[in-house]
């Protein structure tokens, strides 16, 4: 998955198919060439957008979970490839952005929770924290959510973060990529870059 990866620091975007990662990528980079669509799983390989002179890039990783017309074994392989990509490049990953659909994330997590099953979102969130990677959960499509505070509190609870969500604004970023409203995510990334003494990268998230 990383054969054509530019050799530079990066912020990775990951999440289920059809949560708006590619739309968010367009908002973050100002580049319109990323593939988006209604059909889940449009992105099947990493999309890199790099600034060669700055040695920095955003990477949109393939969507995981359900994809129309894709066998279960292939879906699992995609998730495995994502994990391997992150493990292989962890030293260059400045931050990970786990994108979820604000309207359906809690319901999907609950549906796939059980004695023998860990929801992919929870599994990957825990994986990122175990790697000690700065992680932001971008709760996308928040404009479609009623009772936003309750939904965000419930999401925090599922992620193992004690509500209320407002105390986790460095980790929980409610956004609407389609409407261009991504300031909470930009502010969270600004804080991460500042902590890493990478003020040279602040211009990419303002």
UniProtKB/Swiss-Prot annotation:
Binding site residues for GTP: 15-22, 41-45, 60-63, 140-143, 175-177
Top-level taxon of origin: Archaea
Cofactor(s) listed in the protein's UniProt record: Mg(2+)
Matching InterPro entries: G_ENGB_dom, GTP-bd, GTP-bd_ribosome_bio_YsxC, P-loop_NTPase
Keywords per UniProt: Cell cycle, Cell division, GTP-binding, Magnesium, Metal-binding, Nucleotide-binding, Septation
Cysteines paired by S-S bonds: none
GO terms, molecular function: GTP binding; metal ion binding
PROSITE patterns noted in UniProt: G_ENGB
Pfam families, sorted: MMR_HSR1
Protein family per UniProt: Belongs to the TRAFAC class TrmE-Era-EngA-EngB-Septin-like GTPase superfamily. EngB GTPase family.
Function: Necessary for normal cell division and for the maintenance of normal septation.
Name of the protein described by the UniProt record: Probable GTP-binding protein EngB
Name of the encoding gene: engB
């Amino acid at each position: 998955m990383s054969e054509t990866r530019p050799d530079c620091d990066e912020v990775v975007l990951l999440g289920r198919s059809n949560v708006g990662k590619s739309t968010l990528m367009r908002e973050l980079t100002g580049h319109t060439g990323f593939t988006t669509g209604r059909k889940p799983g449009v992105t099947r390989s990493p999309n890199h957008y790099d600034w060669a002179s700055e040695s920095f890039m955003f990477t949109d990783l393939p969507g995981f979970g359900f994809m129309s017309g894709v066998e279960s074994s292939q879906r699992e392989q995609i998730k495995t490839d994502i994990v391997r990509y992150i493990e292989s490049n962890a030293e260059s990953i400045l931050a990970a952005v786990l994108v979820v659909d604000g309207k359906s994330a809690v319901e999907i997590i609950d549906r796939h929770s059980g004695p023998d099953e860990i929801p992919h979102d929870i599994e990957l969130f825990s994986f990122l924290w175990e790697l000690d990677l700065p992680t932001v959960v971008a709760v996308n499509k928040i404009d479609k959510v009623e009772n936003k505070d309750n939904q965000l509190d419930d999401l925090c609870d599922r992620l193992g973060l004690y509500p209320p969500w407002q105390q986790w604004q460095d980790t929980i970023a409610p956004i609407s990529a389609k409407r261009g409203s991504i300031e909470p995510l930009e502010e969270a990334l600004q804080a991460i870059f500042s902590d890493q003494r990478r003020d040279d990268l602040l211009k990419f998230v303002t």
